[in-house]
Amino acid sequence: MSHSDHTAPLEARLSAALSGTARVPGDKSISHRALILGALAVGETRISGLLEGEDVLNTARAMRALGAQVERTGDCAWSVHGVGVAGFAPPAAPLDFGNSGTGCRLAMGAVAGSPIIATFDGDASLRSRPMRRIVDPLEQMGARVTQSADGGRLPLTLQGARDPLPITYRTPVPSAQIKSAVLLAGLSAPGVTTVIEAEASRDHTELMLQHFGATVVTEPEGPHGRKISLTGQPELRGAPVVVPADPSSAAFPMVAALIVPGSDVVLTEVMTNPLRTGLITTLREMGGLIEESETRGDAGEPMARFRIRGSQLRGVEVPPERAPSMIDEYLVLAVAAAFAEGTTIMRGLHELRVKESDRLEATAAMLRVNGVTVEISGDDLIVEGKGHVPGGGLVATHMDHRIAMSALVMGLAADKPVRVDDTAFIATSFPDFVPMMQRLGAEFG
């Protein structure tokens, strides 16, 4: 499997004001999609700013195993020569996606539209995650699961459709991964493939499909939903992609700068896609001093420079419809809530229960062991902010990179140091996290 057997415990201590300018790594969602769409396009796709964490590198290896030419040409610079829609070759060995649900599920969609057989696998964490919700619509399109572990989990062997059928599919939960898998499979189908979602999820796949030359039409559906229609069998053309900085990774230095008094930190080229900025909206509602400037865009994705300063935060209520735009950020938002004055209620977090760990329970445990009063009520997380955090706890990360980073951020402003049992998994999304935070003034040891 992708990860080493060595644990890497670390302690975060009360730090002086953080300061400096940083660019967090490229967005993980865009990085996976650039590699996969580059592999399905004809001609060369040049990618700059690619996130070179383990998850994305596993997707790069998988695309290579499926017949695309994928090469690293420089620092975070990659070239992909694609095989065209439905042009994948059968891989010689199982495709190992390590810890990455996104890479695995999107690749399943892409493979479902090619007449090949491929086996998908991953680490212990990914093997425990649900895959039926992805496979069900792909089977409606003509793909077949010929073998899988209990409950449709990995390792899973998928036989792609020789003649894929376009479908209209209502997603059972707001999930960009389900939507993307159906759209990627729909590339090979004649006619129009439509996905209807009751709550709008991340639209990176739709934007990038258009960047590569596909026809995608998005219409509103109900109060919060969307209807996305893809015209099948396009000729995708290789296109340059500049990967903006990942807002889910920017969340950690952003919250650290807000809770460490006197901090003044600038983060550059952060993606500001409105379906990913729920955390920034929420932190501003809490009183966070966050200034935005230098906005621009690439491959359909907007980005901006942010200046974040130490702030007095207050508790707020976060509505459930905001969850899809910040599902990965609730862990570090809970840390901000612990340092705020007053109660913060985060509603509708059921999707956190099927992430890399049960993130709802793990977040509550991380706060409790450090002296914070927290309650889970159904799918709601309630944090009683006291303006400071006692700290002094050892946090179990459950092989989850975001729990590890959230706990380390908490330790930078807690009264006593916060210890994390293992930071090895941080490499899945943010290999440079510890040194980058240390350059801004964070005290780790």
Curated annotation (Swiss-Prot):
Highest taxon of the lineage: Bacteria
Keyword Cytoplasm: yes
Major localisation: cytoplasm
EC number: 2.5.1.19
Record InterPro entries: Enolpyruvate_Tfrase_dom (IPR001986), Enolpyruvate_Tfrase_sf (IPR036968), EPSP_synthase (IPR006264), EPSP_synthase_CS (IPR023193), RNA3'P_cycl/enolpyr_Trfase_a/b (IPR013792)
Catalysed reaction equations from the record: 3-phosphoshikimate + phosphoenolpyruvate = 5-O-(1-carboxyvinyl)-3-phosphoshikimate + phosphate
Family under the similarity heading: Belongs to the EPSP synthase family.
Annotated protein name in UniProt: 3-phosphoshikimate 1-carboxyvinyltransferase
Organism of provenance: Rhodopseudomonas palustris (strain HaA2)
